[in-house]
């Protein structure tokens, strides 16, 4: 017989080896099960999208135009393309931006949104909420859960294509293009003046017109290198400062505000802010008009929205308003504007049904909400971008830790995120719901909606009224009269009134407390204006 100690070693080794194999097998099984959804994403249906129309709303309450991308336009554009070669991001496209096909994969999703999403119904609610802010929270909407097509956010080509659509909105257009009037109050004598301002929406469709994507143009900012031809700088800055500042860009007493809602130190009129955001000459109203026209042209299509910077924030607001899938790139935090506009938000919406995505990188100070303060580049350029909270989900590429980047405003450009971020990473960023966030925590926003219901009877008059027939000559500093005089005009009025009453009654005074008389005519306040004999 051999040594029993030597006999036990092989058995122990066999048991350990078996345990290791079991653990590895289970780990591989778990890994395979987790990877399964990703494999499905790569086999999801795809469609090739091309631009079909460009809508331009001048944000003046009257001008709205549509440009159809047809053979005539392409001929005009190609002949003038050499003059637009200086425009940034043109080289991102392999062919003309108006001829390139962009492949996007979609998948089946779920959402909870309004049962009635017609522009007339939604805008009527927004108008009501504007006048009755607190009362609008008591409205119970008819929500419904339904299936819809959403972009495959785990597919790299899809995200790159959506980013290229956002970049396409910055491309310059020929000045002699044939625009169609789709507004009601367009002045034909102003042929091209409206082109220098407003919002542009580029409309892409697939061949079957199953999905329509609206790309909203972002900020053309002088000194911020955000892209564009610079024609809308001032109007873009006004809307940026209105949407993303705490109170009308009131950073200090040296700043020129974009509205008159500031009351005192860190105190702002909430109702005034909401009124300013809904003005007809603001960008939010302009994108509502663009959406109205697109739904009229494509009533049966699924509509998505996308955009970069300001265009990304506007696309998120539009998506929240009508329950649309929205993908933004390097957008400023728009959660504060969402609440100020009283946009409908379904209660208790699960994270997987949140179909608003914000794509950005950690080296972009605007996307991260840190481009503020007296010494920041944004402040020096006149932009009060004080918000950092986003609604929906955030898909953040950590280029600071992964690639060693430094925070720089140049990393906000759409060109940077396409060529240096999206094209460099092999995998897409994970999209997660951000932690709880609160903007402008040190400000006090005053609601004055109850002031309209106050009457003069319920509030004391600052100066006491004089008694009949007397007139105050001198008052103390707190309003008490200490010198009186007779008021001839009051005596004359009393005499005339008494004379009128004598025609209908034998009582010589203007106060009727007895006799066979009755009031035959009263004011809307209930005071009797004319007395007469009692009817029997």
Curated annotation (Swiss-Prot):
Q: Which residues are glycosylated?
A: 152, 187, 293, 426, 516
Q: What is its EC number?
A: 3.1.1.3
Q: Which residues lie on this side of the membrane: Lumenal?
A: 32-536
Ranges of the Cytoplasmic topological domain: 1-8
How does the record say this protein sits in the membrane? Single-pass type II membrane protein
State whether it acts alone or in a complex, and with which partners, per the record. Answer: Binds to both phosphatidylinositol (PI) and phosphatidylinositol 3,5-bisphosphate (PIP2).
Identification of the protein by name? Putative lipase ATG15
Tell me the gene name.
ATG15
């Amino acid at each position: 017989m051999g040594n029993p100690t030597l006999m036990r070693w092989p058995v122990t080794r066999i048991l350990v080896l078996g345990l290791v194999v079991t653990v590895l097998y289970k780990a591989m099984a778990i890994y395979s099960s987790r990877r399964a959804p990703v494999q499905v994403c790569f086999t999801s249906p795809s469609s090739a999208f091309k631009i079909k129309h460009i809508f331009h709303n001048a944000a003046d309450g009257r001008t709205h135009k549509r440009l159809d991308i047809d053979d005539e336009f392409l001929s005009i554009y190609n002949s003038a393309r050499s003059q637009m070669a200086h425009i940034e991001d043109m080289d991102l496209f392999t062919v003309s931006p108006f001829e390139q096909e962009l492949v996007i994969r979609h998948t089946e999703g779920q959402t909870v949104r309004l049962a009635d999403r017609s522009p007339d119904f939604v805008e009527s609610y927004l108008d009501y909420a504007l006048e009755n802010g607190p009362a609008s929270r008591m409205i119970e909407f008819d929500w419904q859960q339904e299936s819809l097509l959403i972009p495959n956010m785990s597919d790299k080509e899809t995200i790159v294509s959506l980013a290229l659509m956002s970049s396409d909105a910055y491309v310059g257009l020929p000045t002699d293009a044939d625009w169609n009037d789709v507004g009601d109050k367009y002045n034909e004598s102003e042929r091209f003046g409206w082109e220098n301002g407003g919002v542009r929406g580029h409309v892409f469709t697939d061949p079957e017109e199953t999905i329509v994507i609206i790309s909203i143009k972002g900020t053309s900012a002088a000194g911020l290198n955000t892209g564009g031809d610079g024609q809308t700088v001032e109007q873009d800055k006004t809307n940026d400062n209105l949407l993303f500042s705490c109170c009308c860009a009131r950073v200090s007493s040296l700043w020129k505000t974009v509205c008159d809602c500031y009351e005192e130190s860190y105190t702002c009129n909430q109702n005034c802010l909401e009124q300013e955001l809904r003005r007809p000459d603001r960008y939010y109203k302009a994108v509502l008009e663009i959406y109205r026209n697109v739904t009229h042209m494509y009533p049966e299509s699924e509509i998505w929205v996308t955009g970069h910077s300001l265009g990304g924030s506007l696309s998120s607001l539009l998506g929240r308003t009508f329950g649309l899938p929205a993908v933004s790139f390097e957008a400023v935090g728009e959660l504060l504007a969402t609440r100020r506009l009283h946009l409908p938000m379904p209660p208790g919406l699960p994270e997987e049904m949140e179909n608003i995505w914000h794509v950005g990188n950690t080296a972009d100070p605007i996307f991260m909400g840190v481009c503020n303060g007296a010494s920041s580049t944004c402040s020096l350029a006149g932009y009060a971008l004080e918000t950092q909270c986003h609604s929906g989900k955030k898909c953040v590429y950590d280029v600071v830790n992964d690639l060693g980047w430094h925070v720089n405003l140049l990393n906000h450009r759409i060109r940077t995120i396409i060529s240096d971020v999206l094209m460099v990473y092999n995998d897409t960023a994970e999209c997660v719901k951000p932690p709880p966030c609160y903007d402008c925590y040190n400000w006090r926003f005053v609601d004055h909606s109850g002031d309209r219901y106050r009457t003069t009877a319920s509030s004391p008059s600052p100066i006491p009224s004089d008694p009949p027939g007397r007139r105050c000559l001198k008052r103390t500093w707190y309003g008490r009269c200490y010198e009186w005089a007779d008021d001839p005009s009051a005596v004359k009025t009393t005499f005339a009134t008494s004379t009128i009453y004598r025609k209908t009654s034998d009582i010589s005074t203007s106060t009727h407390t007895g006799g066979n008389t009755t009031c035959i005519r009263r004011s809307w306040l209930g005071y009797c204006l004319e007395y007469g004999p009692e009817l029997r």
